[in-house]
Amino acid sequence: ATGVSRKTLSVPGENEFKGRGVSYCGVCDGPFFRDKMVAVVGGGHEAVHDVEMLSETADKVYAIPGKKGYSEEFPELTYLRENPKVEFITGADVKEIGGSEFVEYVTLEGSNKGRLSLDGVFIILEHVPTAGILGEAGVSTDEGGCIFVDRDMETNIKGLFAAGDCTCEGMQIVTAAGMGAKAALSAMKHVKSLR
């Protein structure tokens, strides 16, 4: 299992507050922040999705795509900009995550610098697939390193199957488990065909 790793902000407070207000998954940890004030840091589609999802339960969601902004104009941004529970903070990067026992604030630098009081920070930066050796072996990947598979979970190399986060699909344990089961069945079928 190669999976993926997440890019981090690498700012003071990030490691200290992991699990105490710093999260890397809105789907996983969002329910803990019902009626709280949170920030979603990231400019990709997954970050936009988490802003949308968290706005349904959190009291306030600060969307902080970073100084570079969003990687593209995602369709969801149109109605999220009209959502009174969502506030976009552009032109700023998170410089520090702080608090005492739990996250209490982030410090921003850039055109919108200052301190923002909140209860949680969702760091939703791009995933970095850890399947580099497979790419070197000729397995087809996209520009981000995600492994391409067909509907049977087979890669471009006959008899080599991939499933889960390394394919960058779903990014949830339950999805990976289902894909793994499908890949295992396909692999068994392939082995039987060799007899």
Each model region followed by its residue ranges:
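A Rossmann-like FAD-binding core segment of flavoenzymes
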Residues: S5, E56-F148, K189-R195
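FAD-site-proximal beta/loop scaffold in flavoenzymes
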Residues: S5, S10, N15-F32, L125-Q172, ...
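Rossmann-like NAD(P)H-binding beta-loop-alpha module
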Residues: R34-T57
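Active-site acidic short loop of glycosyltransferases
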Residues: D35, L118-D119, I157
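Cofactor-binding loop segments of dinucleotide-utilizing enzymes, especially the Rossmann-like FAD-
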Residues: G43, G66-K68, D165
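A conserved FAD-binding loop/helix module that cradles the flavin
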Residues: V48-E52, C166-R195
